[in-house]
Amino acid sequence: VTDYARHIIMQGPTYGLQTDLTNKDLCGFVSNPMEHGEASKLALYGVADYSWNIANYNPLDNWERGLVDLTPEAHEAYRTFAMHSCDTETGYRRIESWETKSFRIDNFTDAEFNALQSEFVRVKNAPAQMEANCKNALLMKELRPWLTEFGKLGERGLKTMSLIKEYKAGNDQAFWEGYVNNRMSKEDVAAYEKHKSGTMV
């Protein structure tokens, strides 16, 4: 969940586990929550499922079920946050934002643009949806600093999408002014670096 990357609260699937182990290979399996006990439950859900039925363990299926079981009233918003909060920046975990396709500013289709814009809307709205619907107050207390920065990420992403339109339309002045206004201040950067998500969007 945090472990060796305290600025990222990893909420992605528990993957990379061998599924051909038997009782001849091991006699037990130990795992523990990190300092954010409630936020650790999604990973522990994966570990529990794996240790119960190793041969049939499916990390993505397990993760999807875990989101629903842990936050049934807010699982879509939690899913949006969790999917974009997986990468450690160390190269150990690399699967993040796997449903999001990015593109170069000079090479994209309308469908790709609309899909990415819609994802940034979901990112922007996820924190408020979690606040309104998630009944686990302790989980919200743990996630709130990251959710705050996640919402800001969505806002910056949507502004960036608007900049792409200005660029394509040849509105150089509007593009430049929008770019300058969308830049993060030193304080913004410091807050984001402390509670980071969306590192691979």
Describe the role of every protein-language-model region:
Residues 1-201:
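Substrate-binding groove of N-acetylhexosamine-processing glycoside hydrolases
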